[in-house]
């Protein structure tokens, strides 16, 4: 076993841990599984990057045969080990997100507050989250559920198309009228 250090998006690391917990795996096992899926499917490793997304450095213990698989994929695609691991995790999340992975924001409001999907900052109210999204991330650069790139104008329409609770949650937040109606309710109380 060797310790391998790599860079990963903070929210993807959180989703990976949720996936591992749901399937009774360790983080290392989840990464090994993601690499094997990527290798067996012979998926061409395409770089998945979103500008302005913070990457964090993390380390895992992996067997030498897994590291050699990572190196082989890295050499074939002419990218780094970190890129291979990031892509393997990304593909794992893409395939499992709609069915198995709850969005970070689905956790209870009282305990966690609302979580920004892009930088994993926590906010006590929807209003605070919405203001943060507008100022810091210029709205919704990509869908937090299915990772599809979005333009700000079509974000609300994208969320409205889907009936699953995850997309509906973001539809509720992306609506323009949500803030004003919420303010009126607060005034009434």
UniProtKB/Swiss-Prot annotation:
InterPro entries: CopG (IPR002145), Znf_C2H2_type (IPR013087). GO terms for molecular function: zinc ion binding. The keyword Zinc applies. Signal peptide: none annotated. A zinc finger (C2H2-type) spans 114-137. CDD domains: RHH_CopG_NikR-like (cd21631). It comes from the Viruses. Gene3D superfamilies: Classic Zinc Finger. GO terms for biological process: regulation of DNA-templated transcription. Keywords: Metal-binding, Zinc, Zinc-finger. This is Putative zinc finger protein ORF189. It comes from Acidianus two-tailed virus (ATV).
């Amino acid at each position: 076993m060797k310790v391998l250090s790599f860079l990963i998006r903070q929210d993807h690391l959180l989703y990976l841990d949720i996936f591992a917990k749901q399937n009774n795996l360790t983080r290392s096992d989840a990464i090994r599984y993601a690499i094997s899926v990527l290798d067996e499917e012979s998926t061409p490793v395409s770089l998945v990057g979103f500008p302005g997304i913070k990457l964090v450095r993390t380390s895992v213990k992996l067997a030498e045969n897994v590291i050699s698989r990572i190196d082989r994929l890295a050499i074939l695609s002419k990218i780094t080990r970190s890129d291979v691991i990031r892509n393997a995790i990304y593909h794992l999340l893409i395939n499992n997100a709609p069915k198995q992975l709850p969005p970070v924001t689905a956790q209870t409001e009282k305990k966690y507050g609302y979580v920004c999907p892009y930088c994993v900052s926590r906010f006590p109210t929807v209003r605070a989250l919405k203001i943060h999204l507008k100022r810091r991330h210029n709205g919704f650069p990509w869908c937090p559920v299915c990772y599809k790139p979005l333009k700000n104008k079509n974000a609300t329409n994208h969320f409205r198309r889907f009936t699953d609770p995850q997309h509906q949650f973001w539809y509720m937040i992306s609506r323009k009228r949500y803030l004003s109606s919420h303010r009126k309710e607060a005034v009434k109380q």
